[in-house]
Amino acid sequence: MKTLIARHKAGEHIGICSVCSAHPLVIEAALAFDRNSTRKVLIEATSNQVNQFGGYTGMTPADFREFVFTIADKVGFARERIILGGDHLGPNCWQQENADAAMEKSVELVKEYVRAGFSKIHLDASMSCAGDPIPLAPETVAERAAVLCFAAESVATDCQREQLSYVIGTEVPVPGGEASAIQSVHITHVEDTANTLRTHQKAFIARGLTEALTRVIAIVVQPGVEFDHSNIIHYQPQEAQPLAQWIENTRMVYEAHSTDYQTRTAYWELVRDHFAILKVGPALTFALREAIFALAQIEQELIAPENRSGCLAVIEEVMLDEPQYWKKYYRTGFNDSLLDIRYSLSDRIRYYWPHSRIKNSVETMMVNLEGVDIPLGMISQYLPKQFERIQSGELSAIPHQLIMDKIYDVLRAYRYGCAE
């Protein structure tokens, strides 16, 4: 990460896409997409996905590392080209506890990530815990971030410290997208960004972390990009120019969250304006969902009724029976809920792919379709971009490859924006 940031600060148009997903097909796609390039791939886990208690994936940081490396070995991607990052590392998962208890868990969280070889650490202590004022004072946020940084430094080996980089910042959207409809978004003020940096510098120095400050590579701000279930707020470069100009006088770049669904031109403009780390998650699993839904429609027409997976019906049944991952985000009416379950840009389906019933139904669908020739006309109907690539000889009409290429469509836009 440090090398890439140095190249950007030297005037090169270069950025990096941060893949924030624990889905094996998304990770496989991210690695396979860049297998034949010289680029490194940044894959990040969030604190609610992966933590010392397992998170919602059931994986600790060490488990996640091995999970990613196993996929890398399978696709022939060199492990040393992978950068592992930890996102929202702080009290995010334990906000209902008092600050002392939440920070104690957060310290162990950060230590486990660093011990497991994660080298890009987002120190995010911005959320209020039980009994805290809302919002937290910037000084409190910075002091807690310094505690987390001290924890990271205390377990890092000399070799790890050479690679270790930190991201700071408090203006982070709700992990995974907005819960309600959005019409506009607040762009971070330069004064607030400067204050975030100033308070963190002061807190780090007070804890004897002067050297660690040199490892702070980025600050999280809101450049004016966001999405909810059916709306996307697109990047307006002119609105972010004060931020773009301010960061030029520092050693850092910006990290932009929730950049999903922007145009490829917007990604190029974001990187030009020093938002050099572009995080993406739901857009990748949304593309995966689109591919699976398309293949399910194809299966419906090609496979005998008694042999079909019933994949789409299984997904809806499971999500309606077990609504904990979408209930507080989606609309309440039955028809509206179904539309959101299927098509929301927030893509809460991503939490359900590991469910045994859904996983089994998708596997059945894939086996069914691997055993037949899919007519080109059906691929044109349901996966038109993939049809064009089949026609030009870039792609085969194999279900797994069709899913990969659908995810590649998202990655292609980021590659354009981050181009070396």
From Swiss-Prot:
One GO CC term on file: plasma membrane
BP-aspect Gene Ontology terms: D-tagatose 6-phosphate catabolic process; galactitol metabolic process; phosphoenolpyruvate-dependent sugar phosphotransferase system
Assigned keywords, A-Z: Galactitol metabolism
Source species, domain of life: Bacteria
Pathway of action: Carbohydrate metabolism; D-tagatose 6-phosphate degradation; D-glyceraldehyde 3-phosphate and glycerone phosphate from D-tagatose 6-phosphate: step 2/2
Database matches in Gene3D superfamilies: Aldolase class I (3.20.20.70), putative tagatose 6-phosphate kinase domain like (1.10.400.20)
Family, as annotated: Belongs to the GatZ/KbaZ family. GatZ subfamily.
HAMAP family hit by this protein: Tagatose_aldol_GatZ (MF_01296)
Role noted for this protein: Component of the tagatose-1,6-bisphosphate aldolase GatYZ that is required for full activity and stability of the Y subunit. Could have a chaperone-like function for the proper and stable folding of GatY. When expressed alone, GatZ does not show any aldolase activity. Is involved in the catabolism of galactitol.
Subunit structure and binding partners: Forms a complex with GatY.
Identification of the protein by name: D-tagatose-1,6-bisphosphate aldolase subunit GatZ
Source organism of the structure: Escherichia coli (strain SE11)
